[in-house]
Amino acid sequence: MPKEPVAETQESQKKGSWFNRMKTGLSKSRKNLAEGMVSILIGGKEIDDELLEEVEDQLLVADIGVNATNRIIKSLTEQTARGDLIYAHSLYKALQTELVDILTPKVAPLIIDSSKKPFVILVVGVNGVGKTTTIGKLAKRLQGEGKSVMLAAGDTFRAAATEQLQIWGERNNIPVVAQGHGSDSASVIFDAMQSAKAKNIDVLIADTAGRLQNKTHLMAELEKVVRVMRKADPSAPHEGMIVLDAGTGQNAINQVELFNKVVPLTGITITKLDGTAKGGVVFNIAETTDVPIRYIGVGESIDDLRAFSPKQFVAALFETDDKE
């Protein structure tokens, strides 16, 4: 029997281990959504309005959100009326298809435009969402793809954020541009852009402050960052990435709306999916915002930031083996 090529075997093992980590990470969300659905949809009873109402309630409890839930129930009701779905158990698979369909149009990989040098990624988000950690993981990922990377410590109000970035930088041999605690964030990022240009760096990832206690001041600061960046490169930032903590539920959508007013958001990274029962918020985000989901994080490991795959995510959530 012919052996599988080693590279393919290793790649499928990698995919498998990530899928298993994601399944483990989503265990609380699975309990909230998939296991609740199983209890409703077992048995051979026919689909009726009462059953569809129970499915609707379960979706709302699982943080799927009103818009996404209404869309799913409308589609399932139409399929039932046409006779495509008859028995309760058939809803289980149909529901997974609906969930994948919600996510698919809202997913787009991050593509680094090599004509922009450096390609500038401005990372925003409130304190505590895992912004600085995400930057470190993303830098490592891009480095692994053969890109030269530089980091800008633009969160100058949190000394720990600068230290954390410097540790990531040292660990992965990535240069970090930083100034003293409390210095001007826009100035740090401008200096980093100049330095990256001089050193012919491919990608510059800039951290920013996330203090929501003084929302007006934070938004003014971010506006200034964008304005000053554009003095160095009128097309910057080339990616405005917001980092969201899955555990914040509906609040995550409010954060997208807030930051999008001052930074042109082009990508979302959703973190901490392993620590919450609110993984359903991913569908809510996809249905209610126009910003594509780039990455998800389901753990602390440097490899636990991955490009988002709707099929894989839904399969892990429902513990099926469809992980393409």
Question: What residues fall within each predicted segment?
Answer:
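P-loop/Walker A NTP-binding module and the surrounding RecA-like catalytic core of P-loop NTPases
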Residues: V100-E324
